[in-house]
Structures are given as structure tokens and as C-alpha cells.
């Protein structure tokens, strides 16, 4: 029998991926991708996850890679299958998430000739991938096996190299497609990796760091702004700098600085609300801002930075990117957070510090939180109360995935500092409302710890297909569904003033009964009517297997007025009590 070159060619590729640290593969069923799927599934060091919907599968893989911070392989057949990966590829690009996209394709002689299920897959994802190549046709010659191993190592290295991101390899494959597993598909050309790819991170010039240290010494009114971070280790360095410089940290919920066992003495969790009040904004106006991580969710913070060019902004990015939507940053420092933290010991000049600056922020923050705690939390029709109740129930060592639009903004407003050790995630690269369910399920597949998904009704509808893997892969998920029957965020925007067209074009109520979704995917459904009922339902869910949908029905018409009344009341009291 003639040897099929596909076996050793694809087998060597898959084996080299495993040596490069790829341990997980998400596979979408298809014929042309048969060798990729079978050889990934048969490799002893790769776990496979089967997902029949390509769009959901891509977000699922991205969720795994997001939690693990290492590449996950994503495999599909030829044709429009790969096009369904596109939204997740875009999100992975902007969120700096490493993905290995492996698409099967027709061989060259069947391209652009009207062959079935054949589209142009060259550079399909454009500039949203860090690396693309159309692999050579399978060949078992030793030179070609060395080539395909080198390609696997290179692609995995590119995905992991700063800034992390997706890569795409397209495989033209001729029939017969079935590999011969008796043919030693993973036989190595040499012991260990064929080639090891090592990449470091950027380091700052020593003179730049000395200049920054001097700037911190001479500037009392400084703040540290912290968005979503690429690595958890960065948190301790940022906290150390904050304490030494006596600068408050304006911590986005995705920084995960609000939760954890580290010191919270300098962490401000209510800055988004505080900066909405003009008098407080004047009192808390910084002269220096040091930014770490992605840009925070907060619009008032962005407006403060954008509208006050006299504020000196320094952006620290260890991945060498350009995260400055204000276009006003004075310095872009491409170095690690640890390098900045070495400034901590020399940053303080106590003679120039009055103590009032940090105390102003801490006073405003603590009073805002105290005033909010005194407000009635029983009425679940006010969406803020969902978050106020939920934050005290989330189990340690679990994950919370927060949907875009209103959920992430409400989490920013209502999630406060606490000693709990859960992690908060969201898809804030492109800020889309698609693929959120699947990303959350991918987080569980990577961590094997409880996952709570907080999501709005439109975003949930967008990715209902994703719930299937909760059933087929036995993935538990607690969904807190905040249902205001439409696009709640638009009620806060100028579009809400145009009553004739608001509901038609922006409110877009669907009237869906999500209890049927729970039945369709084998889950449990409950619609609590009180905070106590909500707590019971939630705690029961996170302590058992399976899918639970906890739907909280809220009133979109009332929420804007309730939200503003709550904020105005709290901010008014802070102004009255202001002691500085």
C-alpha cells in the first residue's frame, strides 16, 4: 500500500505544537480537516474539545487561551467555516490572546475553479493575525517534515511573543484524507523540540526610568490608572509603586486589583462615579497619570484625560503596543511593571508630600461606598442591586465573566474592594456583545473552577448556540441573565431623546422567554423575585454541576432615573461632608 504523506506531515506538525506548549485543541467537525482533527485527537499530550458551531467554537478557544495565557489550537474545514472564526479572531487580536488557527483547504488545483466548498482562504483574517502562511502540500520527505515542524514552532512562538495574538496556518490537503495511525505519525526527527522559540519582553532605558523616578518625587498629585493586565504578577508591583509614591490606583474591575489578598489601602474602586461630579473632579484633578494595562471601561476617566492636556500621562506597556486613545500621552514606556516597581524605594520624597492628596481620594471613595451600602438592596428590578448582592456570593478561586454594554459598566460602579480571590474577565478588545457565552465556557474548560456569567438579554441571545457545549462537554455554568428586554445602554445615550424611533432602532425589545433556552440545552431555570431568593438560587447553582440560568427581569424605563438618583444622592452627601 502506498504511504499517505498526510500522516507523517500533519503528525509532525501536531507533535511540534505540543512540544511548543499547545495542550488544548478545539475542533469543529468537517471532512477536509480530517487529518488535523484525527491526529490532534490521537496525540497523547493534547486534549480535544469538539464544538459544532464555528463562531461559538472560536470564542470558546479564545476563552481557554485567555484564562491559560498560552496558545490554543482551533481547527476547522474549508469554505465558510473559517469565516465564522472572524469575530473571535478580531477580539483575540485586540485583547492580545494567543490563538493557533488551523484551517483545512482544497489543494491549489481546486481553487478558483468552481470546486465545492472552496473559497479564497489566503490572508482570510487580514491584519488581525500576527502571522499567516499557506503551508506546502503534505510530503513525507525528511526535508518537508523538518519544514512543517519548524513552521509549527514558529507559529506558536509568534502567538506567544509580545504582544500575544492569533496566528493562521492554512493547509491545502488532497484526498485521501484519512491518516494511517499505524504509521508512527508523531515520530520525531530529533529528541525534544525541533526548534525552541524563546522571546522576552521589552525593557526600558535606564535613563528613562531615572527620569520617571524624579518626576514622581516632584509630583504629589499623581494617580495610577490600571486596566486589564496581561499577567497577574504585575499587580504586586503596581501596588508597591502606589504605596511608595502615595498615589491612588484607579482600578478597573478587569485589573483584578479590587479583589484578592493584596493591600487595598490605595485602591480606588469608585472613581468612575466620583469623576461624574464637577466639584469632586476639580478637587481630585491629577497632575501626573501613570497607566498600566488596557484602557479602563470608565468614560468619565477617559473624558478627564482627554479634556485636560495639562495632565502629564505616562503609558507603560510591556508588550510594546500603543494604547493611547487620548493622543495626549507624554511618554510611552515599553517595559515591565516590575521595572517600574524598582522605582518604589526611591520614589517618595516625604518633604514634598502633605498627605492630603491620597486622603482626598480615600475619603471620597470610602464615603461613596458607605452611602451605597445604606441604600435599599432588595429591589432586583434596579439592576445595580443585582451586582451589589452578587459580589458577596461569588466563591473564592472562581471566575466571573461579565458581558459588554451595561453589565461591565454596572460591575465597574457596584463591585467594590474585597479580600475574595475570584478573577473577573470580559471581552474588552473590540467590546462586542457576541460570543460572550462561549468565552465564559472556555474559561471553565481551562480553569476547571466555577464560572459565573453576568450577561444582558441581547448578548445572551447572540450566543445561545454556545450553550450546547455545556451539555456535550459537561461544563457547569451559572448564568445571571439581566433581562431588560432590549438594549439598555442606549437609554443612557442621546438617542433616548428621540422617542419616535428609540424603541424601533435602539431599544429593540425581543420579548423572548429564556426558560425555553434552559430546556433546549438541558439546564435549570429560575426567575428570583427577591434578594434572598436570588442568593439561594445562585449558591445552589455554583455548588453543583450543570447549566443554571438565573433570569432577573428588570425595568429598562426606570433604570436611568434610578441610577442617576442614586448617584446624585451619594455625591451630594460627599460634597456636604467634604473636609479638605
Curated annotation (Swiss-Prot):
SUPFAM superfamilies, per the entry: DHS-like NAD/FAD-binding domain, Thiamin diphosphate-binding fold (THDP-binding)
InterPro entries the record matches: DHS-like_NAD/FAD-binding_dom, MenaQ_synth_MenD, MenD_middle, THDP-binding, Thiamin_PyroP_enz_TPP-bd_dom, TPP_enzyme_TPP-bd
Names of the cofactor(s): Mg(2+); Mn(2+); thiamine diphosphate
CDD domains recorded: TPP_PYR_MenD (cd07037), TPP_SHCHC_synthase (cd02009)
Catalytic activity: isochorismate + 2-oxoglutarate + H(+) = 5-enolpyruvoyl-6-hydroxy-2-succinyl-cyclohex-3-ene-1-carboxylate + CO2
E.C. number: 2.2.1.9
Source domain of life: Bacteria
Cofactor note: Binds 1 thiamine pyrophosphate per subunit.
Pathway note: Quinol/quinone metabolism; 1,4-dihydroxy-2-naphthoate biosynthesis; 1,4-dihydroxy-2-naphthoate from chorismate: step 2/7; Quinol/quinone metabolism; menaquinone biosynthesis
GO biological process: menaquinone biosynthetic process
Gene Ontology molecular function, alphabetical: 2-succinyl-5-enolpyruvyl-6-hydroxy-3-cyclohexene-1-carboxylic-acid synthase activity; magnesium ion binding; manganese ion binding; thiamine pyrophosphate binding
Top EC class of this enzyme: transferase
Keywords assigned by UniProt, alphabetized: Magnesium, Manganese, Menaquinone biosynthesis, Metal-binding, Thiamine pyrophosphate, Transferase
Annotated family: Belongs to the TPP enzyme family. MenD subfamily.
Subunit organization: Homodimer.
NCBIfam families assigned: menD (TIGR00173)
HAMAP family linked: MenD
Annotated function: Catalyzes the thiamine diphosphate-dependent decarboxylation of 2-oxoglutarate and the subsequent addition of the resulting succinic semialdehyde-thiamine pyrophosphate anion to isochorismate to yield 2-succinyl-5-enolpyruvyl-6-hydroxy-3-cyclohexene-1-carboxylate (SEPHCHC).
Protein name: 2-succinyl-5-enolpyruvyl-6-hydroxy-3-cyclohexene-1-carboxylate synthase
Source organism per UniProt: Bacillus licheniformis (strain ATCC 14580 / DSM 13 / JCM 2505 / CCUG 7422 / NBRC 12200 / NCIMB 9375 / NCTC 10341 / NRRL NRS-1264 / Gibson 46)
Amino acid at each position: 500500500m502506498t504511504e499517505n504523506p498526510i500522516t507523517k506531515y500533519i503528525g509532525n506538525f501536531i507533535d511540534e505544537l505540543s512540544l511548543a506548549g499547545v495542550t488544548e485543541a478545539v475542533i469543529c467537525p468537517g471532512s477536509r480537516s480530517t487529518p488535523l482533527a484525527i491526529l490532534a485527537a490521537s496525540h497523547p499530550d493534547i486534549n480535544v474539545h469538539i464544538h459544532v458551531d464555528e463562531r461559538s467554537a472560536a470564542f470558546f478557544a479564545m476563552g481557554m487561551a485567555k484564562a491559560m495565557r498560552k496558545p490554543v489550537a482551533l481547527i476547522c474545514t474549508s469554505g465558510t467555516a473559517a469565516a465564522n472564526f472572524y469575530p473571535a479572531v478580531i477580539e483575540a487580536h485586540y485583547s492580545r490572546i494567543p490563538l493557533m488557527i488551523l484551517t483545512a483547504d482544497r489543494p491549489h488545483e481546486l481553487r478558483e475553479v468552481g470546486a465545492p466548498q472552496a473559497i479564497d482562504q489566503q490572508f482570510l483574517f487580514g491584519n488581525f493575525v500576527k502571522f499567516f502562511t499557506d503551508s506546502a502540500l503534505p510530503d513525507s520527505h525528511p526535508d518537508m517534515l523538518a519544514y512543517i515542524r519548524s513552521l509549527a514552532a514558529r507559529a506558536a512562538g509568534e502567538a506567544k511573543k509580545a504582544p500575544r495574538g492569533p496566528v493562521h496556518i492554512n493547509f491545502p490537503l488532497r484526498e485521501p484524507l484519512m491518516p494511517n495511525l499505524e504509521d508512527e505519525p508523531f515520530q520525531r526527527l530529533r529528541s525534544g523540540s525541533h526548534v525552541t522559540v524563546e522571546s522576552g519582553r521589552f525593557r526600558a532605558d535606564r535613563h528613562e526610568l531615572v527620569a520617571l523616578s524624579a518626576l514622581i518625587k516632584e509630583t504629589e498629585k499623581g494617580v495610577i490608572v490600571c486596566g486589564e493586565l496581561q499577567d497577574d504578577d504585575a499587580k504586586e508591583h503596581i501596588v508597591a509603586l502606589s504605596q511608595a509614591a502615595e498615589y491612588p490606583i484607579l482600578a478597573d474591575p478587569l485589573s483584578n486589583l479590587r479583589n484578592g489578598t493584596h493591600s487595598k489601602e490605595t485602591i480606588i474602586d469608585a472613581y468612575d462615579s466620583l469623576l461624574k461630579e464637577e466639584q469632586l473632579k476639580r478637587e481630585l484633578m491629577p497632575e501626573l497619570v501613570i497607566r498600566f494595562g488596557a484602557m479602563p471601561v470608565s468614560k468619565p476617566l477617559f473624558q478627564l484625560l482627554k479634556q485636560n492636556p495639562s495632565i502629564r500621562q505616562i503609558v507603560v506597556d510591556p508588550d510594546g503596543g500603543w494604547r493611547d486613545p487620548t493622543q495626549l500621552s507624554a511618554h510611552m514606556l515599553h517595559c515591565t511593571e516590575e521595572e517600574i516597581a524598582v522605582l518604589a524605594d526611591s520614589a517618595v520624597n516625604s518633604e514634598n508630600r502633605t498627605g492630603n492628596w491620597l486622603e482626598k481620594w480615600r475619603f471620597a471613595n470610602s464615603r461613596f461606598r458607605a452611602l451605597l451600602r445604606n441604600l435599599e438592596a432588595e429591589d432586583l428590578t434596579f439592576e445595580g442591586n443585582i451586582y451589589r448582592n452578587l459580589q458577596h456570593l461569588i466563591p473564592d478561586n472562581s471566575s466571573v465573566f461579565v458581558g459588554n454594554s451595561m453589565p461591565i459598566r454596572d460591575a465597574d460602579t457596584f463591585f467594590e474592594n474585597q479580600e475574595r480571590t475570584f478573577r473577573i474577565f470580559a471581552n474588552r478588545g473590540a467590546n462586542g456583545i457576541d460570543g460572550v457565552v462561549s468565552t465564559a465556557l472556555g474559561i471553565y474548560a481551562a480553569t476547571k473552577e466555577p464560572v459565573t456569567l453576568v450577561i444582558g438579554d441581547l448578548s445572551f441571545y447572540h450566543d445561545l448556540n454556545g450553550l450546547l457545549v455545556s451539555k456535550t462537554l459537561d461544563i457547569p455554568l451559572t448564568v445571571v441573565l439581566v433581562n431588560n428586554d432590549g438594549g439598555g445602554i442606549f437609554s443612557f445615550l442621546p438617542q433616548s431623546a428621540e422617542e419616535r424611533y428609540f424603541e424601533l432602532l435602539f431599544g429593540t425589545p425581543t420579548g423572548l422567554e429564556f426558560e425555553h433556552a434552559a430546556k433546549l440545552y438541558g439546564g435549570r431555570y429560575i426567575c428570583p423575585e427577591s434578594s434572598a431568593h436570588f442568593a439561594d438560587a445562585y449558591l445552589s447553582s455554583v455548588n453543583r454541576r450543570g447549566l443554571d440560568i438565573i433570569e432577573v427581569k428588570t425595568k429598562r424605563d426606570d433604570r436611568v432615573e434610578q441610577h442617576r438618583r442614586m448617584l446624585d444622592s451619594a455625591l451630594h452627601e460627599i460634597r456636604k461632608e467634604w473636609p479638605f
